[in-house]
């Protein structure tokens, strides 16, 4: 979806005028599994990156951005400015990621 909609972390798009439509967001929550927890437990003893969790968070960020873009497109937006991420744990075994920003419509 991001190939059809401009998503930027900046407030302004150079040489582009636009009107603000409003806030948009995309959220996903994924649960950890027993095998990931076992691997994480071992890594916490010896140290190092927990690749299964890194992969899960990367996938979650991608899903959140795609959902953000779907919501913006449904509002007729051409772009999303000031995009940010937030994440957190839920009940110790779930990870939630939200992408949020401001949907805008280009003015000719």
Curated annotation (Swiss-Prot):
Q: Which SUPFAM superfamilies match?
A: YbjQ-like
Superkingdom, taxonomy of origin: Bacteria
Annotated signal peptide: none
Q: Pfam families from the xrefs?
A: YbjQ_1
Q: What is this protein called?
A: UPF0145 protein LGAS_1099
Check the record and name the InterPro entries matching this protein: UPF0145_dom_sf (IPR035439), UPF0145_YbjQ-like (IPR002765)
Gene3D superfamilies recorded for this chain? Hypothetical protein apc22750. Chain B
User: Family assignment?
Assistant: Belongs to the UPF0145 family.
Membrane spanning residue stretches: none
User: Which organism is this protein's natural source?
Assistant: Lactobacillus gasseri (strain ATCC 33323 / DSM 20243 / BCRC 14619 / CIP 102991 / JCM 1131 / KCTC 3163 / NCIMB 11718 / NCTC 13722 / AM63)
